[in-house]
């Protein structure tokens, strides 16, 4: 059960199973993490028999009520004939649109019930992943074309949309510095020159300077966490922000934006790459690279003849593994 909490910290579809009562409640932290990080997860919990539900029975807990604010959907199975359809639907919901956790609560007598399985034809479902409105994409492209100091900030939405290739091509096309959120660390190869570290509380001075001096911030699949904003009233003040995200609820939730595109990040990035020419911002990029060199994160040297320090091992491995970084 404790291990299942770690399963919420990966990007692919996950399944976790727990017994009733304390087993189910031990899943809550993992489910909440998956919900906040948009990780597809199907959590299956046991419960008391149907005739004991609602009677404060031994190890009975209203896990559906507890997890309602932190799941996309949850189910209490009341008929064994419904179980197969519920499981199929749960996996679909977990992966549809903005990904997230779904919970299935199964009473004990359902798990032991006998039923005749009827093979069913797969249901045709409507894909609710919005592609993005072409007019919004075109408007975003015009803003990017006219920017002199663009800055790209990418989050976990790029990774969950499997848009890393499109992200790399977009960064190359726009010729802009790139910062990644904690969940977006796999969105771009961070050995590229254009990568300048994270923003906000865990960020670099280079990223802060870039945000301060840019004239356009392009935000891809990120929800503007308070770890990044720090102060929403002063964050990117007087900057034009384009927010691209699959979840319309995130647009304007934590910060006002100048323009937005709601839809699948992979599709939108591909369309933007079609609309944009190969751009050059040599003076801007040279300035950012100077900051990156001046404010580079460095290990503080510690002299030790008797022991090998972990930071020295990591630095040496990095030097061996990483070749000279290049622009995308």
Model-identified regions with their sequence ranges:
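Single conserved hydrophobic/aromatic residue that forms the stacking wall/gate
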Residues: 1-7, 11, 320-328
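Active-site-proximal loop->helix
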Residues: 48-69, 190-195, 252, 256
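Structural signature of the thiamine diphosphate
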Residues: 12-18, 26-29, 34-45, 68-120, ...
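Glycine-rich beta-alpha junction loops
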Residues: 48-49, 106-112, 156-158, 184-185, ...
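Aromatic-enriched
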Residues: 108-135, 139, 284, 295, ...
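Glycine-rich oxoanion-binding loops at beta->alpha junctions
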Residues: 4-17, 73, 193-210
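Glycine-rich, anion-gripping cofactor-binding loops and their flanking helix/strand elements
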Residues: 158-242
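Phosphate/pyrophosphate-binding active-site segments
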Residues: 81, 142, 147, 238-319, ...
């Amino acid at each position: 059960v404790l291990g299942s909490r770690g399963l919420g910290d990966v990007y692919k579809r996950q399944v976790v199973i727990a017994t009733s009562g304390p087993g189910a409640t031990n899943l809550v932290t993992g489910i909440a993490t998956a919900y906040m990080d948009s990780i597809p997860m199907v959590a299956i919990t046991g419960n008391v028999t149907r005739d004991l539900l609602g009677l404060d029975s031994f190890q009975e807990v209203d896990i559906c009520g507890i997890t309602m604010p932190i799941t996309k959907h949850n189910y209490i199975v009341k008929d064994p004939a419904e179980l197969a359809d519920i499981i199929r639907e749960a996996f679909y919901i977990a992966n549809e649109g903005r990904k997230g956790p779904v919970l299935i609560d199964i009473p004990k007598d359902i798990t032991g019930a006998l039923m005749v399985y009827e093979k069913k034809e797969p249901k045709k479902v409507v894909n609710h992943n919005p592609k993005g409105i072409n007019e919004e994409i075109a408007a975003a492209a015009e803003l990017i074309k006219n920017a002199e100091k663009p800055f790209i900030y990418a989050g976990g939405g790029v990774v969950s949309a499997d848009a890393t290739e499109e992200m790399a091509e977009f960064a190359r096309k726009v010729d802009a510095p790139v910062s990644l959120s904690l969940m977006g660390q796999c969105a771009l190869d961070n050995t590229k020159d254009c990568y300048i570290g994270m923003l906000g509380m865990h960020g670099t001075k280079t990223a802060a300077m870039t945000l301060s001096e840019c004239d356009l911030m392009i935000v891809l699949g990120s929800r503007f966490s308070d770890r990044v904003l720090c102060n929403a009233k002063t964050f990117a003040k007087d900057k034009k922000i384009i927010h691209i995200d699959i979840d319309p609820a995130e647009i304007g939730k934590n910060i006002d934006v100048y323009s937005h595109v709601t839809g699948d990040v992979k599709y939108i990035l591909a369309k933007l790459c079609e609309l944009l020419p190969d751009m050059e911002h040599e003076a801007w990029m040279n300035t950012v690279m100077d900051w990156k060199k001046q404010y580079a994160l460095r290990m503080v040297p510690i002299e030790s003849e008797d022991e090998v320090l972990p930071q020295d091992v990591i630095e040496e491995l990095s030097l061996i593994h990483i070749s000279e970084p290049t622009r995308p």
